Swiss-Prot record:
Residues 94-104 are annotated as: LID. The keyword ATP-binding applies. Belongs to the adenylate kinase family. AK6 subfamily. It catalyses: AMP + ATP = 2 ADP; ATP + H2O = ADP + phosphate + H(+). Keywords: ATP-binding, Kinase, Nucleotide-binding, Ribosome biogenesis, rRNA processing, Transferase. Its EC number is 2.7.4.3. It comes from Archaeoglobus fulgidus (strain ATCC 49558 / DSM 4304 / JCM 9628 / NBRC 100126 / VC-16). Pfam families: AAA_18 (PF13238). Residues 29-50 are annotated as: NMP. Broad-specificity nucleoside monophosphate (NMP) kinase that catalyzes the reversible transfer of the terminal phosphate group between nucleoside triphosphates and monophosphates. Also has ATPase activity. Involved in the late maturation steps of the 30S ribosomal particles, specifically 16S rRNA maturation. While NMP activity is not required for ribosome maturation, ATPase activity is. Associates transiently with small ribosomal subunit protein uS11. ATP hydrolysis breaks the interaction with uS11. ATP binds at residues 10, 12-15, 95. This is Putative adenylate kinase.
Length: 178
């Protein structure tokens, strides 16, 4: 079974994946698999460009694949980690990214971009709001989903997180000023 651990940068994917690996799970990153299968197209501005379609066609991995593109690999299960954009902004500030890249990622989180893509590519999709959870709580939620725990799968079914409605008052106020 192929399980994608995905989400906007800063939601906790790498930290969760590292701990799951320590607990004995078979974990790989999208970049590791792309290197193994010769699916790296280019490196632009220090970022690796991956041919995701080729990788999805060639992948023979059984386990957890971590990365913000992992849900595009046609996984059996996609677990999308989410984070309130206000908190996510603080998490991403320390990454020395341009304001443009920061805003692009915040916008993607607000608009559910990765969740929507996961729903298009994965057989089963779950979403976990990591905003106020400890790392251990997130890991426990991920493990429960992997185990097939019915309560966890019900609790983390997609559609429960809506950042835009939380910001609705602010958006309306802004629109009145325009």
């Amino acid at each position: 079974m192929l399980i994608a651990l995905t989400g906007t940068p800063g939601t906790g994917k790498s930290s969760v994946a590292e701990r799951l690996r320590e607990r004995g799970y078979k974990v790989a990153t999208v970049v590791e698999l792309a290197e193994k299968h010769g699916c790296i197209i280019d490196e632009e501005d220090g970022e690796i460009v991956i041919d995701v379609e080729s990788l999805a066609a060639r992948i023979d991995f059984e386990g957890i694949v971590e990365g913000h593109l992992s849900h595009l690999l046609k996984p059996d299960v996609a677990i999308v980690l989410r984070c309130n954009p206000a908190v996510l902004r603080e998490r991403l500030k320390g990454r020395n990214w341009s304001e443009e890249k920061l805003l692009e990622n915040l916008e993607a989180e607000m608009l559910d971009v990765i969740l929507v893509e996961a729903l298009e590519h994965a057989s089963e999709v779950y979403e976990i709001d990591t905003t106020e959870m400890s790392l251990e709580e997130v890991i426990e939620a991920v493990e429960a989903i992997i185990r097939g725990d019915r309560e966890a799968r019900k609790r983390y079914k997609p559609g429960g997180i809506d950042w835009l409605s939380e910001l609705e008052d602010r958006i309306e106020e802004f629109m009145r000023k325009v």
